[in-house]
Amino acid sequence: MAEAWRYSAQGVAVAVRVTPRGGRDDIDGLETLSDGRPVVKVRVRAIADGGEANRAVTELLAKAVGVPKRNVRLLSGATSRQKQIAIDGDPKQLGEALRRLVAAKPAE
């Protein structure tokens, strides 16, 4: 399966599909959308109101890959379930951390 992130000199940009009010804060592995694009499935307890779910997603990803919260920001999709999230840091280390996270859950 293809990776749901792109590498850059600053870090990685991750394609995610968010489930707000998902019962828990967790990364649920990879999913392939109907158009064939892979995304990282993320669920958060926060509601999709006033940017709460977006903040929860960036905080969850920061903790999961081991970077400060200030290194994770929303690139696009502020009002959509599908988002692009930038994570600043060493691209190789971030890619390895993301691979480990999604490998722990089966792909759909």
From Swiss-Prot:
It comes from the Bacteria. InterPro entries: DUF167, YggU-like_sf. It holds the Pfam family DUF167. Gene3D superfamilies: YggU-like. Disulfide bonds: none annotated. Belongs to the UPF0235 family. This is UPF0235 protein Rpal_0418. It comes from Rhodopseudomonas palustris (strain TIE-1).
